[in-house]
Amino acid sequence: MGLIMVFSSSIALGDGPKYVNAGRYYFFSRQLIFILIGLFAMAFTFLMPMKFWDSKAFWGYCICFLLLALVLVPGIGREVNYAYRWIPIGPFNFQPSEFAKLTMIVFTSAYTVRKQKSIHGLKGFLPIIIYLGIICFLLINEPDLGATMVVVAIVMSILLLGGLGFALFSLLFLSAVLLVIAAILTAPWRMQRFFAYLDPFSQEHAQNTGYQLTHSLIAVGRGGFFGEGLGLSIEKLHYLPEAHTDFIMAVVGEELGFVGIFFVILLFVLLVRKGLNVGRQAIAMDRLFNGLVAQGVVVWFGVQAIVNLGVCFGVFPTKGLTLPFISYGGSSIVISLMAFGLLLRVDYENRCLMRGQKPLGIGASYA
């Protein structure tokens, strides 16, 4: 469904000045390539035993730190709209913030398992907050508040599921809220977005910072219950910016209506529910790392989907977050499929343990 909607929402972009050299199949073909790469990456993460990922968690964090630091280096990171979020690799652009989400799931899960005896106190709590703070500092400086919020939500959920005490969790939650407020208050463009979110159709905002939101709401409103029909969106014809990425759900709403929106939401609900059950099952079989990774993955998908949908429907201020598996984006789809491979691996190892079988995979020393 995601590939179809990317094709539908991007088919007219080649007619505009921004993508003058792009044909109607440009984004479709690139997304297809990204999906194929992602499927190979998913197969790799599925074939590697979970013990392998547990043992390499710290090295993954180090690679994540290096990539996030490199993206801020002039001449290495690519600047788009005053933000440095991409590293050019040939004809493609890699977004380290997507890798950071997956890395922090694995790293926080491994840390929580190793610090089970001290995670309830400051001795075990402070180090992971320092690790998190370093990643958040780099993300904020891109700047990418949306990715920062998702990473914080991932870490908070894993720590809570891993046994973090209510007092420390409340402290972390309050700190996260204050961080978001400070990030908004200290950045004039974020303040403008916030005020535009409060009244997007006002004369002051409708043609400026509220432009995306107003056209997103118009698209969803035009769709009604059953939609205008696949491919028949008007807003994607150079009215709604980023219709194939951050605001693809507005096109879904316009073309497929409430029925299409409900179907997408249902798929995410089923995915999150299944992932949480897989995680609980792993924890019940004394595979805490496996369980935390599985639950962390679906928390990531769920939180990011909620924010993306909320932005498209005017529930949240505009943020640059893709809809997992649906929006156009190479880094997003590849890393999301890698994470899905981990979820499948946890489920596979659960089934093998219940049957008394040895899980198969690459690397006998990790089995």
From Swiss-Prot:
GO terms for cellular component: cell division site; plasma membrane. Keywords: Cell cycle, Cell division, Cell inner membrane, Cell membrane, Cell shape, Cell wall biogenesis/degradation, Glycosyltransferase, Membrane, Peptidoglycan synthesis, Transferase, Transmembrane, Transmembrane helix. Its EC number is 2.4.99.28. GO terms for biological process: cell wall organization; FtsZ-dependent cytokinesis; peptidoglycan biosynthetic process; regulation of cell shape. It is found in: Cell inner membrane. Pathway: Cell wall biogenesis; peptidoglycan biosynthesis. It catalyses: [GlcNAc-(1->4)-Mur2Ac(oyl-L-Ala-gamma-D-Glu-L-Lys-D-Ala-D-Ala)](n)-di-trans,octa-cis-undecaprenyl diphosphate + beta-D-GlcNAc-(1->4)-Mur2Ac(oyl-L-Ala-gamma-D-Glu-L-Lys-D-Ala-D-Ala)-di-trans,octa-cis-undecaprenyl diphosphate = [GlcNAc-(1->4)-Mur2Ac(oyl-L-Ala-gamma-D-Glu-L-Lys-D-Ala-D-Ala)](n+1)-di-trans,octa-cis-undecaprenyl diphosphate + di-trans,octa-cis-undecaprenyl diphosphate + H(+). It is an enzyme of class 2 (transferase). It is a multi-pass membrane protein. The chain crosses the membrane at residues 32-52, 57-77, 87-107, 119-139, 149-169, 171-191, 251-271, 296-316, 323-343. Its main location: membrane. Belongs to the SEDS family. FtsW subfamily. Peptidoglycan polymerase that is essential for cell division. PANTHER family: CELL CYCLE PROTEIN, PEPTIDOGLYCAN GLYCOSYLTRANSFERASE FTSW-RELATED. This is Probable peptidoglycan glycosyltransferase FtsW. It comes from Taylorella equigenitalis (strain MCE9).
